[in-house]
Amino acid sequence: MNGQNIRIRLKAFDHRILDASTREIVSTAKRTGASVRGPVPLPTRIEKFTVNRSPHVDKKSREQFEMRTHKRLLDIVDPTPQTVDALMKLDLAAGVDVEIKL
């Protein structure tokens, strides 16, 4: 794959699982002879939800919940066919969303 890059974008709610998956991808790519740029930590998206604590009274009593989406970006430079095969066979954690662009 001459002059081609693979861009991998990872998303997860738990940053520990995300970092472990990132380390696994980086080690697999380096083992097969490709060079890796990253991981680049992208901004964390924080969604906040405010709800009433009580079902019908006490408007002033509220509770807040938040959902954090952590993201990482990896670039694999000049991947070999072995790199692509190894990445396809890689089994990552269940809570990690992977987007791959060639």
Curated annotation (Swiss-Prot):
Any one Gene Ontology MF annotation carried by this entry is: tRNA binding
Give the record's GO biological process terms: translation
Source domain of life: Bacteria
Q: Name one GO cellular component term.
A: ribosome
| UniProt cross-references to PROSITE patterns, sorted A to Z | RIBOSOMAL_S10
Q: Keywords on this record?
A: Ribonucleoprotein, Ribosomal protein
Q: What does this protein do?
A: Involved in the binding of tRNA to the ribosomes.
Q: Which family does it belong to?
A: Belongs to the universal ribosomal protein uS10 family.
* Quaternary structure (record): Part of the 30S ribosomal subunit.
Q: Could you tell me what this protein is called? A: Small ribosomal subunit protein uS10
Gene (UniProt) = rpsJ
